Amino acid sequence: MPDPREIIEAKQLVVEGKDTGAFFEAFMDDMGVTGIQIQNFGGVRELSVFLKALCIMPGFKAQVTSLGIVRDAETNPVAAFRSVCGALNGVGLPTPAQPLVPVGQSPRVCVLILPDAATPGMLETVLLRAVADDPAMECVDRYFRCVGQQTGSLPANMPKAQIQAFLASRPRPGLLTGYAARAGYLGLDSPAYDDVRQFLQALQGPTGLPA
């Protein structure tokens, strides 16, 4: 498990893995959002331990006004949300009634489940929605149909494989998610990211996002 970093911002965003953190950093830069510090809690089984460590960091109780947590739904979005709430409850933090609905004060807590509160999947599922109308996606679909027909099997994690195949079609192939977002390859203005925008607005509090 990664250790929490020194708290330097009142608004803390806790994400699952470095790739998700890099994407959110790029997304916030694109939106002009500042004042949010990203923390990486590692894997899903490490969230409870990470939150315990974060809550005893110097400055957490006195400084932190907002706490956002991002987790993949994986196979069950309801179970994923309950798991996050269990981790929050375990350290005495407010537990939201549902994703995207903030609760409490100092810290105000909000949870985002990806791709959404009702669908299995992950960050890459959201990315695929954002680029669904790109002409290259037809090629990606044909590629995996061919792979399945020729080999009799497909990658275990299809969303990750599909987004990597899509990014291989870009002028600068092979970029990781955060770099791909900064390069303009992931359609950051897409409605597919509406939940992400709503989540960041909740994390920002009454001031909201920049105009």
Residue ranges of model-derived segments:
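Early extracytoplasmic/lumenal segment of secretory-pathway proteins
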Residues: 40
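A short, flexible N-terminal coil/short beta segment enriched in small residues
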Residues: 1-19
